Amino acid sequence: GHLDVVPAGDGWTETEPFSGEIKNGRIYGRGTMDDKGPMVAAIYALAALKDAGFAPSKRIRLLFGTNEETGCGDMSWYVSHGGELPVYGFTPDGEYPIINGEKGILNGTYSRKLHQTGDYRLTKFEGGAASNISPAYAAAELQCPADAASKISADKVTVTPIEGGIRVEAEGIAVHGSTPEQGENAIGRLAQALNQLPLTGELGDCMAFVAERIGMEVHGESLGLAMRDELSGPLTLNLGVAKFEQETLSLVFSVRYPVTLQYERVYPR
């Protein structure tokens, strides 16, 4: 199992994210289910076996990972430095009934430097905290004509005049990046809102690409990535992080592809 967690994020209502407070028999906090709580349960399970007098015929070990959420670099280091791997193992990082497979994961970054021209100039575009979280909030700022605000009309999007332009904010529903269909992606919603503006040049092309080829889709249909199998269902695409720095827009995404498909087939697409 693993002890690292996804970013705490905003919107905690019961407790602070790392308080570990117990209320009505429940522990609240980031990682209580994924995966600190299950790791503690595994320790107690071994203790229960020992107290019951169970004598295993094979050695039992616990491995505590610290980098599962962002690539398992800790395990690569462990193996390359002589760490022992199990003959048989399982991880208490799932649900009941037992999960015996996991989709492949392909993380990447799409970056494009924008040589901006025309009356609309992007100065800020940001949202999300990690590739494996569907973001609940994203915002952009543009230098543009005063009437730009009237050109955007979209649900869960707020446009506010600022000096020399506008600020556009989009709301979503945050969920884990492995199940983006259960949420609403604020970055995709923001791109669709900005695509209503008469953007020109590379800025217009880039925003149209994000809005029309990704947008609120979660299976990569418009990117030509849609694929599925009977065992694990469809490929999913999560747009997790957006950042605009030094005239470059970067989008960090996470693809989960069906268990029966090979990386070599998915990556070229």
Q: Which residues fall in each region the model found?
A:
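Active-site metal-binding loops of divalent metal-dependent hydrolases
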Residues: 3, 68, 94, 177, ...
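Small-residue-rich helix-loop
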Residues: 266-268
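Active-site alpha-helical elements of protease catalytic centers
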Residues: 31-46
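Short helix-loop-beta-strand segments that form the rim/entrance of peptidase-like active sites
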Residues: 49-68
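Structural motif
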Residues: 25-26, 60-61, 87-90
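Midchain, well-structured core segments that form catalytic/ion-binding scaffolds
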Residues: 75-258
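Acidic/His- and Gly-rich active-site-bordering loop/insert found
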Residues: 1-30, 51-56
